[in-house]
Each structure stands twice: as structure tokens, then as C-alpha cells.
Amino acid sequence: MNVGFDAKRLFFNGSGLGNYARSTVRLLAEYAPDNRYTLFTPREGNCCGFEVPDNAGIVTPQGIRALSGSLWRSYAMGRAIRLSGVDIFHGLSNELPADIGRTRARSVV
């Protein structure tokens, strides 16, 4: 299964939602290693020394979409989710992209 995460908070928040996101991804990667974990973020960061697990990958906006990370997260991340083959998507910060309905992925906040 390919599990996708809105990982902005994972990479840029040192506490609260960032801790929740890092713990969730780290523990799932460790205890469910057969899954693939896809981390969607407007840009890569390195908050708190988080190391991306071997069974995880990072997706960032490309081209013109990279100009506005917040617009990408809200209105274009669904396309990236679809192209990445995500089966289930978790909006870690209690948000889902507006275009999540255009994907085949199940979603949860």
C-alpha cells in the first residue's frame, strides 16, 4: 500500500503537529515496512533532524507550481497524489487538498 502524507508540518514544525507527523511516519515505516510512504511538502526542510525512512519518498511541486507552496497544497497537490499512486492520504494538519476528490486515494484527517 502507498500511504501519502501532507508533510509540511513534518519538515517545518518543531513541536505539536510536527512531532505528531514525524512520530506517525517513523513508527509506520518501522512497524509496517512493506508499505510505501510518500511525503508531500511544498519544499524540503530538515526540522529536528528527521531522517526520511528507506521506504519513504518526498514529493515537492515542480515548475510553475513551485512558486506558491500554499496554493500547491490547497489546489494542486491532488494531481501529485494521483500521479504518485497513493492509496490512502492523511492530512496530518487536519486539512485535505481541495482537489483530493480527483484522486482514487481514500483520505483521512
Predicted features and spans:
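Carbohydrate transferase catalytic cores enriched for Leloir-type hexosyltransferases
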Residues: 1-109
